[in-house]
Amino acid sequence: MNCDNRIPIIMCIDVEPDGFFIDRIKPLPWNGYEGAHRYFSELRKRIEETTGSPAHYTWCYRLDPQVAETYGSAEWPITHYSKFTEDFIKNGDEMALHPHAYRWIEKKQNWVEDLGNQEWVNHCLEMGFDAYRRLFNRTCESFRFGAYWISTETINCAERLGAAFDLTVEPYFKMKKRFFAAELYSAPLPDYDHVPREPYRPSRADFTRPDVTRKDGIWVIPVSTGKIKYQFGRLETLKKRIFSPDEIKPRTVTLNLSRGMNGFRSVMEELLGSLEKPYLVCVLRSDVCGEALSNPTDPVNMRQNVDYILNHPLVKQFVFSTPREAMSTMGYLNGTLAAGVS
């Protein structure tokens, strides 16, 4: 057992355009990414002064066919904002991949998240890993697939391409309804209900199951999640029992920095108190830091949740880490902590 009492925090910022099913002719700006660069660059000094440790973020880039077709090259987010990337690398941040499976369908005159087409999904991965290698002259270690989605075949493909850490899986998460029309997706979400909440090496036959016999290969580092049962007044509870019973059931809450404070704090405290080796994986879309917001409370929540983290009683134990640094701190990479047993 590793006696290190440091608590790693992996801060994943998904670097994306300011939209989803974007216009190929009139490309959306990446104002959110520009805002994220400003915000997290300024935040870094505060984190380091508060925790007493260097702060390293994980920037997860869209280097995929939608970006290539819309902006002229899969490498565009890196080459267009090269000074940002240089700054991140200088400060020890992780450059990771965040591919989506958007495919342009002429008949629909729209993009489709073609998650049900494994050949296309593999193509998206290969494009991203190839672009990454050209840009950085090394293999990408860390990735998290888009649209809350991953599959066994996709993790196996990423491993073949050289990935060491996957940060996609959100334990307990089951989305019953997509944010956009169902016909814009070619596959349902996987069932994350029984996925471990601590890092594990996945079975090559079923990514949701740990394979404790594996001694090498990719690690799944689950995003931090928990279940929250929201409380309502007696009359409101009665109404919900009749008209919307799902609303009084426990809900899965992800440590997304843009989430409302109550759910974020409850899950954070539960994780810190229950995991054998506590760690946090927080996520955020870059567009939350921009101007074209679908929910104007998102940046307010982000700042309040960051304040909560940095005013926490355990803050001196927090270390904002890359995936590899976090796994080393927790003892997984040197074999002092068993994997996939929670």
Q: Where are the regions a protein language model picked out?
A:
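Active-site beta->alpha N-cap acidic-glycine motif
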Residues: 1-87, 91, 309
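Hydrophobic faces of well-ordered beta-strands that scaffold small-molecule active sites
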Residues: 9-13, 57-59, 95-98, 141-143, ...
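Short catalytic/ligand-binding loop motif for oxyanion handling, primarily in non-cytosolic enzymes
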Residues: 18-21, 66-70, 103-107, 149-154, ...
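Well-ordered, non-membrane alpha-helical segments in soluble/globular domains
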Residues: 29-44, 74-82, 121-126, 257-269, ...
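A structural motif corresponding to the C-terminal end of an alpha-helix
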Residues: 39-55, 83-94, 131-139, 207-218, ...
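Metal-dependent polysaccharide deacetylase catalytic core of the NodB/CE4 family, i.e.
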Residues: 55-57, 62-149, 227, 285-287
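Active-site-adjacent pocket scaffolds in enzyme catalytic domains
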Residues: 145-276
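C-terminal domain-boundary segment and adjacent tail
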Residues: 242-342
